[in-house]
């Protein structure tokens, strides 16, 4: 009996071990199959994400849409009934920008350097110029239509080009000069188109006030770009480093200016954010801030997957849909002069882009000389 009992116990242990081994192998096979499916799915989704990330047309479309979104949302807020908290609007946009790029950095999508006091001191003059540029831009957009604003913005290119000649030894080619003449012509045509739509003395006053802010913005923008170019050489900032410091340092300046120069009485706040469209206005303010990040990100994306040449052409072509968006979403003047100015300005941008490409090509073909 002892032998039989020992034999039966041995058989039982053998069966248990066999059952456990079979079950374990089945579980391992099931896990392997699941991993294979997951790997295939991940590979497929990863492949799709890679295709999108490396798609030139998608990057170009994203850049154009982000540009239009920012312009339209800014115009929506600024054209609201008696909106006068421009500094506050710009502060909100800068805060949203900092939060957005901080979130993107935490997700390892973008990277930028940590805050440094010495670099902040070197960069602080740029922050003041940025505030001057974006404030005058907001005032110009408040009084001018999007097409006219977009056309007159081209004049900044002329100031920057001749600023580069003076400060950096740049050169203005014959083709570039031709594009400048077209830019001036488009601005003159836009002026006639705007004047044709004037119906009252108040409209004329608002129009000329818009031109004043636009002219101021052109000089402020040119000064910002030229001086920032010098500072970038000192600090060796990349795109998102520049965005980080620009927005971070401008926030306190904008908030202080808002609290000092703007009316924060309950009546004025209610006037700027009426109950009927308060949520829509705040949403537009947040979207305009986020879209500024989108423009910078899509700019870098477009250059990476296409070329700087393609990007410069896209920048020129992009002025047409931005100008047309003003005709579609807002009551901009639509007449022969206004429509003609859009296409002349569009042509000027194309000629300038081609001129810059030819100039860069000639410079790259020049062999370095040594004494």
UniProtKB/Swiss-Prot annotation:
Quaternary state and interactors: Homooligomer.
GO molecular function annotations of the record: antiporter activity; GDP-mannose transmembrane transporter activity
Main location group: Golgi
Topology in the lipid bilayer: Multi-pass membrane protein
PANTHER family on file: SOLUTE CARRIER FAMILY 35
Positions in the Lumenal compartment: 73-80, 139-145, 193-206, 263-281, 330-332
InterPro entries (UniProt xref): TPT_transporter
Protein's UniProt keywords contain Iron-sulfur: no
Protein name: GDP-mannose transporter
Alphabetized NCBIfam families for the sequence: nst (TIGR00803)
Protein role: Involved in the import of GDP-mannose from the cytoplasm into the Golgi lumen. Involved in hyphal formation.
Similarity-based family: Belongs to the TPT transporter family. SLC35D subfamily.
Cytoplasmic side: 1-51, 102-121, 163-171, 228-241, 303-309, 356-371
Residues carrying covalently attached carbohydrate according to the record: 268
GO BP: any one term: protein N-linked glycosylation via asparagine
